[in-house]
């Protein structure tokens, strides 16, 4: 957590980050952390809200829970990649079940990377600092 406190928000461009997670405690923790890093955050707790908010907010990065109650994260990732203003959005899958099949399906659906919950704050900070490449 110390690395987060050393980050100067003005040192890097602010990103728009959408958190898609049905666990409100996890959403709150990630949102606070990402705001401390100097980024703008919105969140959705289900797939329908995720699509709606993504269309309006146009995030540069989406942290997407694979196991949502209404849609699988794979389906959301595929849908987002077809959206005209979102096809270049970086989608990072997060899952409580980091099995190889989950990873494979997430990558096939358009996710850039897959991480187990909870995400390490230093890894999250590095991901948000990185440009898509």
Language-model segment annotations:
Residues 21:
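Conserved acidic carboxylate
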Residues 24-42:
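Two-component/phosphorelay signaling modules centered on CheY-like receiver
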Residues 44-45, 68-71, 80:
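Hydrophobic residue at a beta-alpha junction
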Residues 57-63, 68:
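Active-site beta3 strand of CheY-like receiver
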Residues 69, 87, 99:
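The feature encodes the CheY-like receiver
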Residues 1-18, 122-133:
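Non-catalytic signal-transmission and effector/linker regions of two-component phosphorelay proteins
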């Amino acid at each position: 957590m110390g690395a987060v406190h050393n980050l100067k928000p003005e040192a890097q461009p602010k990103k728009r980050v959408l958190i898609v997670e049905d666990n409100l405690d996890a959403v709150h923790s990630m949102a606070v952390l990402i705001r401390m890093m100097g980024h703008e955050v919105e969140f959705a707790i289900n797939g329908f809200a995720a699509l709606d908010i993504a269309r309006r907010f146009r995030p540069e990065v989406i942290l997407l829970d694979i196991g949502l109650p209404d849609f699988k994260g794979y389906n959301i990732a595929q849908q987002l990649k077809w959206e005209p203003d979102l096809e270049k959005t970086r989608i990072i899958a997060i899952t409580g079940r980091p099995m190889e099949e989950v990873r494979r399906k997430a990558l096939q659906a358009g996710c850039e990377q897959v991480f187990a919950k909870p995400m390490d704050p230093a890894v999250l900070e590095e991901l948000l600092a990185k440009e898509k490449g």
